[in-house]
Each structure stands twice: as C-alpha cells, then as structure tokens.
C-alpha cells in the first residue's frame, strides 16, 4: 500500500510501486495509468516499450511499476511516475470481468451486490472503515 506523501518524498528517485489500476488512457506516443491504493492515487506516464506493456491492463487489475518520480505541474497532485521500459511494468493480477456493467439497471445490481463496489460512491464507506481501523491499530501499537 502506498501513500501519496511517501511518493512525494521520493522526487528524483526510482521507486517500485504496486497498486490497483483505476484508469488506462493509451495515446499515440504515450500511455497514462492511474494507480490507486486506498484513498491515494498517482498517475504514471508510460513511454516507448512501456506504452505497449500496459495495453493488457484493465480497471481494477493489480500491477507493479518501477518508475522515476517526477514533479509535474499538470499531473494530479503535482507528482507523476515516468516509466520507460517494458521490464519496469508487471501485471500481477488481471481483474476478472464482472457479469454486469456499472450502468446496469438496479434489478441486475441487486442480483450482483458485490458489483456495486466498482463505483466509488459505494466504496467510500469501506474505505473510511479501513482507514479508521488502520489508524486505531497504529494508535494501539504506539501505546
């Protein structure tokens, strides 16, 4: 699990980061991959061989990237990861396709309740609970 503050402290360094894919946008000369872990997300810019290596990524797949951390004004949060080689890209676990689409009728969603958690508004309660538990454990360990 990564936090944005840990990544921001690594500007100018190469790091390995693992996370879930929130979005992949492939353009003519580069690809953008947004990774998330809990509440934190970061954008990776993949060029050259790395651009082709991210093609199999799908939303919610678990991946690892080795990248240089760069300060970038146009990136979300002012930080982005730059990946240049295919060897720096690893698909750890490809996300399974869901039996229904996020825009399905409410009846289908009720038949597949776990699919609701693909939508951010549905996961906020679980994210808040996870963060609260994490902070409580950290507090108790410090005592």
Residue ranges, per PLM feature:
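Class II aminoacyl-tRNA synthetase catalytic cores and aaRS-like
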Residues: 1-143
């Amino acid at each position: 699990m990564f936090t944005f503050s840990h990544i921001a402290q690594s500007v100018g360094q190469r790091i390995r980061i693992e996370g879930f894919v929130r979005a992949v946008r492939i353009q003519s000369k580069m690809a953008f991959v947004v990774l998330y872990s809990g509440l934190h997300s970061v954008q990776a810019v993949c060029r050259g061989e790395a651009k082709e290596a991210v093609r199999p990524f799908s939303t919610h797949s678990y991946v690892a990237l080795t990248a240089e951390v760069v300060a970038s004004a146009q990136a979300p949060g002012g930080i982005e990861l730059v990946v240049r080689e295919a060897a720096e890209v690893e698909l750890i676990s490809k996300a399974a396709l869901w039996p229904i689409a996020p825009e399905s009728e409410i009846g289908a969603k009720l038949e597949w309740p776990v699919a609701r958690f693909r939508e951010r508004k549905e996961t906020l309660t679980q994210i808040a609970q996870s963060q609260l538990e994490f902070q409580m454990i950290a507090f108790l360990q410090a005592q």
